[in-house]
Amino acid sequence: TVTCERRQVNRVYVSNKTMADGVEYIKVSAIGSQNDWSAFSEIWDSLPSKNTRAVILDLRGNGGGLIDAALKMANVMTPVKDAELAGVRYRDDMGGLEQTYSTGNALPLNKIVVLVDGGTASAAELLAGSLQDTGSATLIGSKTYGKGQGQFHIDLVNGDKLVITTLELELPKQGCWEGVGLTPDIQLENRKVTVNTKDLKPLDTSTTLRFGDSSDAVYAMTERLSLLGLLTEATGRYDGNVADAVASF
C-alpha cells in the first residue's frame, strides 16, 4: 500500500556556477514564481563575496513568467538610477500605462552578457530587452521569440477557449516587440561545446593585458573568448582579432 499526500511543489528555475575567477554564470530557465526571484536575489547578493566582475545570464529557452519578478531582476542589474526599465500598457479602463524605473543600486560589475535564442519569450524578453535598452548588458545569441503581449484565457462551456489580450509590454527604446522579437547585439547560433574547465589555463585577473602582449595570460583569456564564439581559436598574442573580441565582450 502506498499513501500519497497532495501538496504544492514549488520548483525553482534558477541556478548558478562560477566559471572562472571573477566570472559567474547564472541560468534562469523560467520566471515561474516569486521563488525564482528570491533564488536569483540570493545568488546576486552573494557575488561581492566572490569578487565577481562579470556575469553571464543565460535566458535561452526561457519562455517567461511573472512580469514583476523579471523587472526586479532587471532593476538589480541596472546601474543607472531612474532609468526607464519597461512599461506595461493595460487597457485604459484597467489603469493604462504603468512604467518602472531603476533604483540605481546595481553591483559595480565590468560586464553583463545575456544569452538569448528563439525560445526566449515574454517576461524573459522583457528582462533581456530592458538590460539591452538601458545599456546595462550585451545580448548574444539569436533573435528571440517575439511575445510582447499578455492574454487572459477563458474556458467556455462548449470546450472552446476565449483568449483576450489584456496588456502590452513596452521597452524604453524598442517599444513592443510582439511578433518581431529582440535582435542580439552579437548574433550567434546555439552550439553545444563540451569543455573540461580543468584543461583551461588559469585566468590571472590581476594582470593588465595590452595590445601586442604575448603571454600565457593572453592565451588564458582567448581560450574563454573562443568558447564564447568571439574568436575562432585561442592565441597567446594580443593582436587585432583579440582586441575586437574583447571590445565585443
Show where each model-derived region lies.
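Short acidic, glycine/serine/threonine-rich helix-capping segments at coil-helix boundaries
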Residues: T208-Y219, E223-F249
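Active-site lining segments that contact anionic ligands and/or coordinate catalytic metals
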Residues: L109, T134, V157-I164, T183, ...
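BRCT (BRCA1 C-terminal) domain core and associated BRCT-interaction motifs
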Residues: L139-I140, T144-L162, L167-P172, V242
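A short, sequence-level motif marking secondary-structure junctions
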Residues: T3-V9, L167-L169, P184-D185
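Primarily N-terminal secretory
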Residues: L171-T207, D216
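Long, charged amphipathic helices and adjacent flexible linkers at domain junctions
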Residues: N10-Y13, S206-F211
